[in-house]
Amino acid sequence: MNLLVTGAAGFIGSHFVLRHVANHPEDTIVVLDKLTYAADKSFLDPVEDAITFVEGDIADQALVTKLIEDHSIDTVVNFAAESHVDNSISDATPFLHTNVIGTQAIIEVIKEHPHVRLVHISTDEVY
């Protein structure tokens, strides 16, 4: 399996990557993360040799397309999200950009690559 895992430097995404690498070392994992306030790339240090890390935005359709095509991705697991409700009240823009526009961008790319599956992960913190 060739996975593109977005938001993998966040708490939940990083735990998914750590567990997946441990249980499926034969799989290819490409990580795409914007490294915003909720991310910590060091969460992925234990598996840094087993993954490809790309800093970038899920709303960048050209980047997502390139990663899917260059790495023969067959599954996108989307953990990317802005969370922390208090922050969204003071400025909703980054939340709309990532949680809505970013997710839409991934879906648009996948529509052009129908063999790619999407697993969308969310938490109560994005609402």
Question: Predicted segments — roles?
Answer:
Residues 1-127:
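N-terminal Rossmann-like NAD(P)+-binding domain of SDR-like oxidoreductases, especially those catalyzing
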